[in-house]
Swiss-Prot record:
InterPro entries: ARFGAP/RecO, DNA_rep/recomb_RecO_N, NA-bd_OB-fold, RecO, RecO_C. This is DNA repair protein RecO. It comes from Ligilactobacillus salivarius (strain UCC118) (Lactobacillus salivarius). The gene is recO. It comes from the Bacteria. Gene3D superfamilies: Nucleic acid-binding proteins, Recombination protein O, C-terminal domain. Involved in DNA repair and RecF pathway recombination. One of its GO terms (cellular component) is bacterial nucleoid. Keywords: DNA damage, DNA recombination, DNA repair. Disulfide bonds: none annotated.
Amino acid sequence: MIYKNVEFSAIVTKRKNYRERDMLVTMFTDKYGFKTFFVRGVRKRGFKLGAAILPFTHGTYIGSINSEGLSFITATKGIDQFQSINQDIILNAYATYILELVKAAFEDSIDVTNTLWFEKVLKALSLINDGFDAQIIANIIEVQLLGKFGVQPNWRSCVICGETQSQFDYSESYGGILCRKHWYMDKNRLNLDQRTMYYLRKFSIVDLNYLNSIKVNADTKKKLKLTLNEIYDNQVGIYVKARSFIDKMTKVENNLLKKD
């Protein structure tokens, strides 16, 4: 099915050359999920949509959406670009990671929650672009996206007794947190410190629209990263390309800190 002359909001995620003068541009749209657009004549003099199809550009687009094949853009109505993300390799990597994770969760499906997730991702990228800690914003998305992968940990209360005020640890076997008196039930629980647990629980409910500031020390950031990597590896079972780059950059940074 083709939806002609529709207006939609979108974020440009990537593009690649196609033939001599054309491009294939992938966008995350608010209504149609991730779609690939065929853009003709990109290299022709006077091409008017050049700025609109740069990576990490977002705005309102008009075009035809094909439910199965390539879609098409005919015009735009106001666009903006995440310049800091484009200019910083680390910010770029985390923004790409967020988009790749969301794409893995949604693919080309039209989901009733797609618009909500589009707005959430747009806000996440805006925060990263404005100077918020890119890893922490990505961690928040990781935690909140787990449900879309069929993994819905209970972060609110102990999965055994419902306790909400205690020391907690995360259990992959039980699919959520265990209070201290039930730690004995899972010898393979993650043995997380309470500061890491606090942030994981907080991340599961935080609304990015009301996030004014967030500061997490380096040690806790490292533990959050390792914990979420383990959950995604063991329970979700996906590994997106951008994470590999982030892991390498983190390793280089840690080695430099050791030398200092």
